[in-house]
């Protein structure tokens, strides 16, 4: 009898673990600047963007790359202007070096060409608002851009921030300039080395939202890259969002022990 109960309890534990694992992750990709007939566009990659000349919507729902299912996640671009020209939707050709971080994430999925540029003065920024998220789940974000302008464009720096998130882990490229766990900079005027802004284990706020903010470099005095241009830096090029799964209250091993102990207590197995 006890053996039968033990077997049943083990099956219950396995079922609970399997149920948690079955919450399969998904990935969604967005090409912020897609030029029809010139660049490739993979099926289920969205093309939301912003800027002068942009023919696509500034907001919409992301699709699961694998099967095209609607993720229910809404992305929207909001520009905070400074002066002069606003962000331009530019179709410059670009690539990333083989084996680079950007290459590993985006190669053969999102065309590296194109960028969303900058305003003609300091203090502009672009918010990528990601909403419709599950507050009880975790996500990964990866973003990058490359004008591929050569050495003369290295001073054109992009500052990336993650905002309004309930926790995250810094996972940006090793050679990127880390300012803090939620802030990083690297050159986007020349980024053939394929640096990326990446955060994992992002917990959305209670409103199911977090924001990725891009702008020009903040300057050396504020902890940014030395010699960064006063206002030139590229706002966006492409990004990937991944659903990791539900937040875990405890690590898996502790969870199994807790479930097993509770079941033993409830049925008084000795």
Where are these regions (language model features)?
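Contiguous ligand/interfacial binding patches
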Residues: 24-46, 146-245
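Residue-level detector of buried hydrophobic side-chain packing
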Residues: 139-143, 239, 263
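Bacterial N-terminal signal peptides
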Residues: 7-16
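Positively charged n-region of N-terminal signal peptides that target proteins for export
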Residues: 1-5
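Short, flexible loop/turn segments at beta-strand junctions in immunoglobulin-like
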Residues: 130-134, 201-203
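Surface-exposed, low-complexity/disordered Ser/Thr/Gly/Pro/Asn-rich loops and linkers
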Residues: 65-131
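A short beta-strand element within beta-rich, extracytoplasmic domains
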Residues: 135-150
């Amino acid at each position: 009898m006890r053996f039968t109960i033990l077997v049943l309890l083990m099956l219950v534990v396995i079922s609970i673990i399997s149920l948690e694992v079955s919450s399969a992750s998904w990935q969604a990709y967005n090409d912020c600047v897609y030029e029809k007939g010139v660049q490739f566009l993979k099926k289920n990659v969205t093309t939301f963007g912003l800027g002068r000349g942009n023919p696509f919507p500034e907001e919409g729902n992301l699709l699961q790359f694998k099967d095209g299912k609607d993720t229910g996640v809404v992305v929207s671009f909001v520009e905070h202007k400074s002066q002069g020209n606003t962000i331009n939707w530019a179709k410059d050709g670009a690539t990333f070096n083989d084996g680079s971080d950007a290459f590993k994430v985006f190669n053969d999925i999102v065309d590296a060409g194109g960028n969303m540029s900058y305003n003609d003065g300091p203090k502009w920024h672009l918010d990528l608002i990601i909403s419709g998220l599950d507050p009880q789940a975790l996500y990964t974000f990866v973003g990058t851009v490359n004008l591929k302008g050569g050495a003369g464009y290295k001073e054109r720096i992009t500052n990336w921030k993650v905002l309004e998130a309930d926790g995250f882990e810094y996972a940006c490229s090793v050679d990127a300039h880390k300012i803090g766990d939620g802030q990083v900079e690297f050159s986007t005027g020349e980024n053939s080395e394929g640096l990326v802004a990446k955060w994992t284990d992002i917990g959305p706020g209670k409103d199911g939202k977090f924001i990725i903010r891009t702008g020009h470099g903040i300057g050396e005095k504020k902890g940014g890259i030395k010699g960064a241009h006063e206002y030139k830096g590229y706002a966006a090029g492409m990004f990937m969002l991944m659903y990791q799964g539900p937040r875990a209250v405890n690590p898996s091993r502790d969870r199994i022990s807790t479930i097993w102990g509770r079941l033993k207590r409830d049925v008084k197995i000795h």
